[in-house]
Structures are given as structure tokens and as C-alpha cells.
From Swiss-Prot:
Residues 165-308 are annotated as: Disordered. Disulfide bonds join C304-C312. This is Merozoite surface protein 2. Residues 165-206 have a biased composition (Low complexity). It comes from Plasmodium falciparum (isolate Nig32 / Nigeria). The N-terminal region appears to be involved in lipid binding. Residues 85-156 are annotated as: 16 X 4 AA repeats of G-A-G-N. Residues 53-164 are annotated as: 6 X 8 AA repeats of G-A-V-A-S-A-G-N. A lipid is attached at N321 (GPI-anchor amidated asparagine). May play a role in the merozoite attachment to the erythrocyte. GO terms for biological process: cell adhesion. Glycans are attached at N22, N36, N224, N296, N320, N321. The gene is MSP2. It is found in: Cell membrane.
Length: 347
């Protein structure tokens, strides 16, 4: 009888320790699986969409287009033109170029910034208006030419010169600081230089082609618009100097044709920088990050079907629960059996 008692007691402790080990093992795997799933979800959700494409487009593309051609016009010249009188003067006299350029460029550019205003104003305005009106001058040199013209004398001077007269004008800048005014009698040219920024040799013919001289109008236009045509003609593709004899009204269509590629050249940075500012790269990265979540869940499901209990997700937690329940049932049965045997032996 004593032997049976001792064996029953030993059996009881053996099964108790065995079941405790099994329970601890299953509980540890369950905790590890839950911890691994939480880590995976946190890592998958903590990955932000990368904004490299949009940052490069907004940082490099728009800054380059607004920085080279249009920041100078909107920053220095167009602010002064809208403040002093380029809104009415250049709006009426400069036709469409300074009307759209100084009107929209300085209005929207000084109001909203060089990105929108200088992009539309200096791009469209200087491309179409000043490109066709001033030949190739302000089309290529919209950065410096339009600045000085709008800053110094854009009240009434830009009305006459940029409207009709600048089509038949050619100017060449000479680095001098004196002020000289000469008027010829043979109806060829009138030359005046301004000592404010730099000097210009400016020749103008009558649109009728009869050889009459308009010295007062030429002097007025060259004094008010000496800064308009300073850096613009040096950057154009036409020769710097040209006599008044060759400037018949038939030369105006050629100048308008020469201004057309400059308008396309000034509008080309906008066309290049416009699709970059849409930020389509961010949407692509965002959709990619959204599509990563079902991929992780599918991988976890594959690992669960393969039988890897360490990398398994929520499906194995159910299996662990069922195995835990089965082990608990076994544990209860063994305890009850040992208790019955012990009571039977002691009784």
C-alpha cells in the first residue's frame, strides 16, 4: 500500500511539472507571435512616403526658372513699375507685352510671389508682348531690361516706344557715363544717351518711310527707354548697330519673326517646370506605401500555411489557444485521476 501511495504521489508531481512546462511553452510562443505581429504592423505603418521627386521639382526646377529670368524682373523692376506707374503706362503703351507682363507679372508677382507671378508675367508677358514689341530685346533680356525700364521711367515713355516704335528700333549699349544729344538733318537717326545706368545709340525711322525726322520723339523715347533696351539687345540674335536707311517698314515683319523664337524660348522654362510642380511623385509613393500592407499580410499568411510558428500571425494564435485548451483539459483529467487514486488509497 505504501508503494502505491508513493507511486501515485510521484505520478502526480510528474504530470503537474510536465503540464506546467507545456503551458509555459505555448504561452511563450503566443506572446512572441503577438509581439512580432505588433512590431511588423508598427514598422509597416511607420514608413512615410518619400517626397524626393516633388522636392527636387519644386526646389530645383521652379527656383531655376524664377531665379534666372523672372526673379530680377519681379523683384527689382516690376515692384517699382507697379508702384510708380507701369500699371497704366506700360499697360496702355506697351500693348500686350508690358500689359500682361507688368500688369500680371508685377501685380501677381509682387502679390503672390515670383513663382506664380513671375512665371506667368515674365514668361507670357515678356515672351509675347516684349518679344514681339521690342523685337528680340526684352524677350531675351527680360531679367535686366524690364527691370530698369519699369524702375526708372515707365510712366509715358514705355507707351510710345514699346507700343509701335520699338519694332523698328535697334539699340546698342556703350559703357560710358557722359550725356550727349545729337540730332541729324538728313532724316536718318537721332542719338541720345542717359547717364543714369548706361548709354544707348538709338535710331528710329518714320513708319511711313518718307524719311522725315522726329528728333523730339526719338530723344524722348531713348531717354525714357534707355534702360529697357540696355541688356536686351546685347542678348538678342540681331546685330548691335544698324543704320536708319535699312530700317524701312518692311523690316518690321522680319523683326517680328525674329521675336517669335524668343517668345518660345522665354515660355519654354514654364513648360518644362510646370509638369514638375504637380507633385505626381508623392502620389506614387503614397499608393506604393498603401499597397505594402496587404503584401505583408499575404506573406504572413504564407508563413502560417508553411507551418512556421515563429513568424505566424493571428491564425496561429487561434491554434495556440486550441492547443492550450486541450492541454488544460488533459491537466484537469490527470489531476482528477490522481486525486481519485489518492483518496481511494488513503481511504
Amino acid at each position: 500500500m505504501k508503494v502505491i501511495k508513493t507511486l501515485s504521489i510521484i505520478n502526480f508531481f510528474i504530470f503537474v511539472t510536465f503540464n506546467i512546462k507545456n503551458e509555459s511553452k505555448y504561452s511563450n510562443t503566443f506572446i512572441n507571435n503577438a509581439y512580432n505581429m505588433s512590431i511588423r504592423r508598427s514598422m509597416a505603418e511607420s514608413k512615410p512616403p518619400t517626397g524626393d521627386g516633388a522636392v527636387a521639382s519644386a526646389g530645383n526646377g521652379a527656383v531655376a526658372s524664377a531665379g534666372n529670368g523672372a526673379v530680377a524682373s519681379a523683384g527689382n523692376g516690376a515692384v517699382a513699375s507697379a508702384g510708380n506707374g507701369a500699371g497704366n503706362g506700360a499697360g496702355n503703351g506697351a500693348g500686350n507685352g508690358a500689359g500682361n507682363g507688368a500688369g500680371n507679372g508685377a501685380g501677381n508677382g509682387a502679390g503672390n510671389g515670383a513663382g506664380n507671378g513671375a512665371g506667368n508675367g515674365a514668361g507670357n508677358g515678356a515672351g509675347n508682348g516684349a518679344g514681339n514689341g521690342a523685337g528680340n530685346g526684352a524677350g531675351n533680356g527680360a531679367g535686366n531690361g524690364a527691370v530698369a525700364s519699369a524702375g526708372n521711367g515707365a510712366g509715358n515713355g514705355a507707351v510710345a516706344s514699346a507700343g509701335n516704335g520699338a519694332v523698328a528700333e535697334r539699340s546698342s549699349s556703350t559703357p560710358a557715363t557722359t550725356t550727349t544729344t545729337t540730332t541729324t538733318n538728313d532724316a536718318e537717326a537721332s542719338t541720345s544717351t542717359s547717364s543714369e545706368n548706361s548709354n544707348h545709340n538709338n535710331a528710329e525711322t518714320n513708319p511711313k518711310g518718307n524719311g522725315e525726322v522726329q528728333p523730339n520723339q526719338a530723344n524722348k523715347e531713348t531717354q525714357n527707354n534707355s534702360n529697357v533696351q540696355q541688356d536686351s539687345q546685347t542678348k538678342s540674335n540681331v546685330p548691335r548697330t544698324q543704320d536708319a536707311d535699312t530700317k524701312s517698314p518692311t523690316a518690321q515683319p522680319e523683326q517680328a519673326e525674329n521675336s517669335a523664337p524668343t517668345a518660345e524660348q522665354t515660355e519654354s522654362p514654364e513648360l518644362q517646370s510646370a509638369p514638375e510642380n504637380k507633385g505626381t511623385g508623392q502620389h506614387g509613393h503614397m499608393h506604393g506605401s498603401r499597397n505594402n500592407h496587404p503584401q505583408n499580410t499575404s506573406d504572413s499568411q504564407k508563413e502560417c500555411t508553411d507551418g512556421n510558428k515563429e513568424n505566424c500571425g493571428a491564425a496561429t494564435s487561434l491554434l495556440n489557444n486550441s492547443s492550450n485548451i486541450a492541454s488544460i483539459n488533459k491537466f484537469v483529467v490527470l489531476i482528477s485521476a490522481t486525486l481519485v487514486l489518492s483518496f481511494a488509497i488513503f481511504i
